[in-house]
Amino acid sequence: MASDEDDKQAKHLPTSSLLDVLTPPTGYIVDRALCSAYSGQCAVLVAMLAAMVRQGTAEGKGSSDLALARALERLKDRVHFLVQHGRLIGPRSASPILNMLDRFVVPVKYDERKASWHPKVCVVRCVNRYSVKAKPIWLLWIGSRNFTKDESWDMALSLTGEVDGKGDELADVNSITRRLAQQAGVEAQWLSALQELGTVRWQVPAGLRIDKLVLFTHGDLKRDLEPVPANARSVLAVSPFLDEWSVSNLVRLLPPATDPTKKPRLISTVACLSEMAKKHRLALARYNMRSLPESSQDDQPEEIDEPANEGADAGADAAESRGLHAKFVWIETPKRGELRLGSTNLTRRGWKENAEVLATVSVALPGGSYSEQMRSGLKAFDDFCSEYELGEEEAPPDDELRLQREFDDARNALVVDFVATQALQDSVAVVTLRSPLHLPVGACLRIGRIGDALMPWDAGVTSLKLPDAPAHDNGDLLRMELVIGDLSSEWLQHAPFVPSLSRDTRDVPLLHAYLGIDGVISLLNDSLTAGGNGGGRRRPWNKPHTTGTSVQNIALLGIEAVLSSWVRDKESLSETKRIVELARKCEATSEKEEKAIQQLKAFLTSWDAIEQELVKP
């Protein structure tokens, strides 16, 4: 049963899904996308890919094996997820199909002992699949949430733009996109799109003005926390993590308020405010403090583990409270409002060291209906929070803090030091380190493939053979688990194959093993059908295909559908051709699949005959 607080939240602040933002408009397909976050879960990346081929749901549930297969085939080399190295989480028991995420994930190798890759931003280009004359549409999302299942409070800026359309010119989008493309190593593939961005006009709601969009990276010198102007009459600062430097600098130009009700408002979590109060009570005393209740989702089991807490300021990256992810500052002056939102916590690490994204939006006051709606929503959010009073706090035991810091340092050092490659030697995958590891006393490190049992990796060892498995079960992402005493952390570590695993030797047989013959036939039917649903069975994407069981009789569509696919649109034809090549690799794994194989071979014979006729010079 929903609580009164749940009802209040639903009434005042309806939510929108990141997956909705990533879903292309009807008639359009995703041509390319750059998506960045600090951390991610494999299941959420699957949901994002499914949304990009219009096969997902707002909740990320219900994605089928066919939806995932279509997304993996269609979006490879087009979509890239930039995630802090060591912060992608994989399920402990999973289908090897998740190995194909290595075609999409770009691990950004920041040393977290110094700084983190932390921007939350998506840039998506969509093209009309039916008309080359239709103008491309661009989607931009700048927010505070990671690519995880967490359902905490968030705030984001979402804009739609069109080439040569009506709206505002936002040159900063080009700068952000270029930096993302450079970080992903795909700037050359994005050159024409970057040039096109200069002609895009963005639909900004009336009463709002986008003043600045910027992506900071580690080492940038011209970046700082801009203080609130001295004439601000109202300030609302929201961040799940705080430090004294940011809290003090934000209001350093404001005269101290004599009326307690006129103080700037600061919203954070109880845990963060309590920790800050131990050493920085004077800095907090400048504010009226408020906190959020625990999220109602905290008791829900997660399919994939969340990252472990990482301590004080580094923990601002790793353990962001499930109750609060939103990071923004709302400032009202006599003539206008200013909203600063993005990925940056109110910490010096966030504003000076991390890679972060920031959007600054001006709002006309009193303004039109949209600005009034936004002010009303912010007030409802503020009212939803609870008052926080400074109390006497006892410092936690020093030993507990020391052990946590030592574990955090060991984990972050391990992610940096575990520089490894993989290779197939006599069909066996061998992981080889560049140099031996030096693990802390009592530390236990285990590694393995996605979905495999983990194997111990001892200090001083420089190579390890993984258990025998089909070649297509391998991937560039290895599961890692570090245990020191009662503390543990698990993540996916990037260890690329040299030479790289090819589409023919890894992707095609992996897709075949994942789908089975009946799945390949269903996928073919889907690609031959204009609506993308050619019948046949579907199963949840994370449920395994069972070999050797009875195969459904799924009639492949006839010659009319084949001919239609050749004239429908270029993208549909390219997709069908890729699936046809996948179908050519299929082999029966049981007598029960022989009938399906014969059916498939008959279809391929017809396809070849039609192709030969249609491509005659």
Identify the residue ranges that each predicted region occupies.
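Active-site glycine-centered loops adjacent to acidic/histidine catalytic or metal-binding residues
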Residues: 343
